[in-house]
């Protein structure tokens, strides 16, 4: 049995809030807990292990600790690079990606680790062929890995894929992104032009997907707001793929309130709160107090203030009552049309505005 995880983005920080970095480490800890429960033979990591161009010692240390924990429980680790994995070093060669650097630094089978990484260069007698053979000998399964590539190298990758497909059968293909350079995040755009693989595993797309032999695994936590409320977890692949869900380590809460009818917002010091607040100019102090209170009760708070009305509406003598209502009341127009009859005998537009301001206090 193998497990497929991807897009850990270790060290990711949301909105420059340093404390949010812990979300990535907590997510990996949850994955570790599940992996130790299910005890796969191998864990495949589909790239974007790290998040930033320059990877810190702490981030590398966290990943090495992960390898050690897996190895102590007789679980091997196989990884490729994603587009986030050491872009500072990733120039023209896959060999400069972080997983390969770890391998060359001694985190490899020759030094007692069950950790294997692929650059994605399948020349004769290349390290990738040797790595493939080592995994076959140890685990009786063929894993073919390709690290992140740029679109100018697509012809080279297709050539390697055709070589692999001629020489291997029933193998697991491990890649970071789709082969369509213009649609790298659309699983429907994957076009492998090969036949003999058992499963093709992809990361990068930040979604859960399984159709036919194509599997995409999501990140273990929400990297951004748009990923909130999407499934987090990883795949276990034995006789058939099974998805293992985990709780999101970076909870986002998005909601809207009206200061005229405020509601209680339950505190969560681990969560990121995105809040639309509808207010009037007379409620500025109330809005500021809300900001202060919420920032003490959430890890990070972003408030989008939405002014319900302006204090001074410029009207023309020529404007009729209905036009004034539309201008002043905006989205409340339909409701306040019920007041229209109250203004039947008032001719002056400014007087109408004064009445509206009175009703809005």
UniProtKB/Swiss-Prot annotation:
GO MF entries: endonuclease activity; exonuclease activity; metal ion binding
Binding positions for Mn(2+) 2 per the UniProt entry: 48, 83, 176, 204
Keyword Metal-binding belongs to the record: yes
Positions of disulphide bridges: none
Regulation: Nuclease activity is regulated by Rad50.
InterPro entries: Calcineurin-like_PHP_ApaH, DNA_Repair-Maintenance_Comp, Metallo-depent_PP-like
Role: Part of the Rad50/Mre11 complex, which is involved in the early steps of DNA double-strand break (DSB) repair. The complex may facilitate opening of the processed DNA ends to aid in the recruitment of HerA and NurA. Mre11 binds to DSB ends and has both double-stranded 3'-5' exonuclease activity and single-stranded endonuclease activity.
Assembly notes: Homodimer. Forms a heterotetramer composed of two Mre11 subunits and two Rad50 subunits.
Record's protein name: DNA double-strand break repair protein Mre11
Organism for this UniProt entry: Nanoarchaeum equitans (strain Kin4-M)
Encoding gene per record: mre11
């Amino acid at each position: 049995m193998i497990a497929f995880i991807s897009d850990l983005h270790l060290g990711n920080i949301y909105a420059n809030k340093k404390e949010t970095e812990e979300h990535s480490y907590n997510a990996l800890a949850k994955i570790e807990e599940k992996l130790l429960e299910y005890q796969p033979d191998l864990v495949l990591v589909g790239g974007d292990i790290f998040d930033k161009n320059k990877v810190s010692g702490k981030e590398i240390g966290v990943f090495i600790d992960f390898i050690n924990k897996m190895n102590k429980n007789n679980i091997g680790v196989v990884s490729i690079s994603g587009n986030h994995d050491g872009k500072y070093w990733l120039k023209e060669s896959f060999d400069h990606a972080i997983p390969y650097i770890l391998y060359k630094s001694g985190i490899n089978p020759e030094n007692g680790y069950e950790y294997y990484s692929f650059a994605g260069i399948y020349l004769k007698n290349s390290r990738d062929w040797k790595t493939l053979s080592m995994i076959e000998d140890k685990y009786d399964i063929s894993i073919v890995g390709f690290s992140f590539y740029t679109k100018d190298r697509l012809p080279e990758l297709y050539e390697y894929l055709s070589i692999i497909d001629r020489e291997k059968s029933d193998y697991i293909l491990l890649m970071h992104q789709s082969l369509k350079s213009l649609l790298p995040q659309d699983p429907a755009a994957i076009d492998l032009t090969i036949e003999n693989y058992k499963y093709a595993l992809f990361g990068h797309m930040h979604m859960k997907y399984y159709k036919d032999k194509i599997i995409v695994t999501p990140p273990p936590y929400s990297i951004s707001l748009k990923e909130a409320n999407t499934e987090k977890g990883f795949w276990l692949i034995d006789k058939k793929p099974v998805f293992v869900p985990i709780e999101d380590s970076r909870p986002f809460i998005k909601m809207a309130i009206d200061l005229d009818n405020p509601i209680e917002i339950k505190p969560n010091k681990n969560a990121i709160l995105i809040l639309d607040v509808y207010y009037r100019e007379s409620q500025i102090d109330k809005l500021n107090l809300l900001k202060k209170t919420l920032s003490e009760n959430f890890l990070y708070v972003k408030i989008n203030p939405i002014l319900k009305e302006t204090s001074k509406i410029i009207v023309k003598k020529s404007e009729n009552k209905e036009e004034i209502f539309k201008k002043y009341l905006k989205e409340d127009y339909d409701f306040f049309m019920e007041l229209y009859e109250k203004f039947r005998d008032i001719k002056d537009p400014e007087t109408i505005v004064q009445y509206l301001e009175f009703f809005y206090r």
